[in-house]
C-alpha cells in the first residue's frame, strides 16, 4: 500500500481511558511514531459503565455516549498527529474499537450480538481520516465469538523461531494468546481466548473503598491476606470449566456478580478482598497457561495489568519455570499493544485480509473485519 501510517484507538473494559498510537507499517513491520492517552471524563465513564447493564432509555443514552466517545477519540487522534508532526492526509485509516457494553456471542438465536458504542461517522468528520470500526460483528456472523481479536496481531508481533510463546493481555478482562514457534512444521494453529476477569473487579473494589481508580502497583492488595473461601467461590464460576473458544466480559464479571460471591464474607477487611481478587486474576490466568500452553516457557504480559507489580509476582509464583516479562522488552510497551492491534486490524481491513483467527474465535473461517467510514 502507498500509505502505511495507521492510527489505532482502544478503550477497553477497564474503562480507565483511551490509548492511541500512530503506527508505521512500512516494510510490513510496526514502528510506533507516537503514543497518546486520555482519561474518560467522569460523566462519560459513569454512563458507559451504567450501559453495561440493562436500564431505562438505553438507545438514547447509548447514542449520546457514542458521540462523546467519538469526540474523546478525535482528541487523542489530534494529539498523535501533533506530537508526530503528521498531517491527517498522510494517515491511511484510523481503527477505532469503540466501547464494549454488551457481548453475547452465539446466544439467543445462534448468532447473538456484540455492541461497541461508538460514532465512527462523527469520528471521520472530526479527524478527516477514514475510520474502520465494528470489528467484531463479522466474526460473530461467521459463527465466532468475536473475541479475542488480538491473537492475530500478537502472532505478527511476538512469535519467534524455535520457541512457543504465551501472551497475556490484562485489561478489564484478561485474554491469552498461545503462539506456536514461528518455524514450527505444519503451521500449527494459534490458540486464544478470554481467561476471565483482569483488572475490572480489582479496579471496582479499589474505587469503592479507596476512591482510587486502580490499585497502583498492587500495593493495597499486597497489604492484605487472601481469603481462601472467597477465592474458591470466585474460581467456581462455570465459565472457567468451559473449553475454548470462549469469550466473556462485564455481562458476567461485574459488581453484581462480585457482590453475590462476597455475600458469605460480609465483614471481610477490604484489603483482604483486594488481595483475593488479585490472587483470583493471577490464578485463573496461570491455570490457563498451564492447561493449554504448558510448552511455553515465556509469558509476555501486556495491558494495564502488566504495571501491577503484585499481580506479576503472583503470576510468577503460579508459573515456576516460566519467564514472565512485560511486553516492553519484546516489541511494545504494555499500554500500546492493544491500540497498535487495532491499527493493524484497520490495515488488514483496507488490504482485504482476514483479521480474525478461526482457531481462536471458532468462526467458520478467516474474515475481513470491520466497516469503513470514509472521511
UniProtKB/Swiss-Prot annotation:
Superkingdom per UniProt: Bacteria
InterPro entries xrefs: Anhydro_N_Ac-Mur_kinase, ATPase_NBD
One example GO MF annotation: phosphotransferase activity, alcohol group as acceptor
Reaction(s) this enzyme catalyzes, per UniProt: 1,6-anhydro-N-acetyl-beta-muramate + ATP + H2O = N-acetyl-D-muramate 6-phosphate + ADP + H(+)
Signal sequence bounds: none
Involved pathway(s): Amino-sugar metabolism; 1,6-anhydro-N-acetylmuramate degradation; Cell wall biogenesis; peptidoglycan recycling
UniProt xrefs under Pfam families: AnmK
Keywords (A to Z) from UniProt: ATP-binding, Carbohydrate metabolism, Kinase, Nucleotide-binding, Transferase
The protein's Enzyme Commission number: 2.7.1.170
Positions with a binding annotation for ATP: 12-19
Alphabetical GO biological process terms: 1,6-anhydro-N-acetyl-beta-muramic acid catabolic process; amino sugar metabolic process; peptidoglycan turnover
Function according to Swiss-Prot or TrEMBL: Catalyzes the specific phosphorylation of 1,6-anhydro-N-acetylmuramic acid (anhMurNAc) with the simultaneous cleavage of the 1,6-anhydro ring, generating MurNAc-6-P. Is required for the utilization of anhMurNAc either imported from the medium or derived from its own cell wall murein, and thus plays a role in cell wall recycling.
Family: Belongs to the anhydro-N-acetylmuramic acid kinase family.
The protein, known as: Anhydro-N-acetylmuramic acid kinase
Organism: Variovorax paradoxus (strain S110)
Amino acid at each position: 500500500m502507498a500509505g502505511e501510517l495507521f492510527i489505532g484507538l482502544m478503550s477497553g473494559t477497564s474503562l480507565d481511558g483511551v490509548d492511541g498510537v500512530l503506527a508505521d507499517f512500512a516494510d510490513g513491520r510496526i514502528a510506533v511514531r507516537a503514543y497518546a492517552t486520555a482519561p474518560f471524563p467522569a460523566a462519560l465513564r459513569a454512563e458507559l459503565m451504567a450501559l453495561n447493564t440493562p436500564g431505562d432509555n438505553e438507545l438514547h443514552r447509548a447514542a449520546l455516549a457514542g458521540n462523546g466517545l467519538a469526540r474523546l477519540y478525535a482528541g487523542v487522534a489530534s494529539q498523535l498527529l501533533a506530537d508526530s508532526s503528521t498531517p491527517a492526509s498522510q494517515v491511511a485509516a484510523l481503527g477505532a474499537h469503540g466501547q464494549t457494553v454488551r457481548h453475547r456471542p452465539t446466544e439467543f438465536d445462534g448468532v447473538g450480538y456484540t455492541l461497541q458504542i461508538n460514532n465512527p461517522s462523527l469520528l471521520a468528520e472530526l479527524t478527516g481520516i477514514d475510520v474502520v470500526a465494528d470489528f467484531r460483528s463479522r466474526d460473530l456472523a461467521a459463527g465466532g465469538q468475536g473475541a479475542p481479536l488480538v491473537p492475530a496481531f500478537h502472532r505478527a508481533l511476538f512469535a519467534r523461531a524455535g520457541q512457543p510463546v504465551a501472551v497475556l493481555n490484562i485489561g478489564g478482562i484478561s485474554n491469552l494468546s498461545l503462539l506456536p514457534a514461528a518455524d514450527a512444521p505444519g503451521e500449527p494453529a494459534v490458540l486464544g481466548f478470554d481467561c476471565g476477569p483482569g483488572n475490572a473487579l480489582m479496579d471496582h473494589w479499589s474505587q469503592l473503598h479507596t476512591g482510587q481508580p486502580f490499585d497502583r502497583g498492587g500495593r493495597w492488595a499486597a497489604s492484605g491476606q487472601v481469603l481462601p473461601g472467597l477465592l474458591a467461590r470466585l474460581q467456581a464460576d462455570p465459565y472457567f470449566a468451559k473449553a475454548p473458544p470462549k469469550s466473556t466480559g462485564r455481562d458476567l464479571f461485574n459488581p453484581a456478580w462480585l457482590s453475590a460471591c462476597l455475600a458469605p464474607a460480609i465483614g471481610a477487611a477490604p484489603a483482604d478482598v483486594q488481595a483475593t481478587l488479585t490472587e483470583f486474576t493471577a490464578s485463573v490466568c496461570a491455570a490457563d497457561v498451564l492447561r493449554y500452553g504448558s510448552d511455553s516457557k515465556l509469558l509476555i504480559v501486556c495491558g494495564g495489568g502488566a504495571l501491577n507489580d503484585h499481580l506479576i509476582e503472583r503470576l510468577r509464583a503460579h508459573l515456576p519455570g516460566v519467564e514472565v516479562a512485560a511486553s516492553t522488552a519484546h516489541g511494545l510497551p504494555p499500554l500500546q499493544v492493544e491500540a497498535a492491534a487495532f491499527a493493524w486490524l484497520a490495515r488488514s481491513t483496507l488490504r482485504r485480509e482476514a483479521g480474525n483467527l478461526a482457531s481462536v474465535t471458532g468462526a467458520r473461517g478467516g474474515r475481513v473485519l470491520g466497516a469503513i467510514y470514509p472521511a
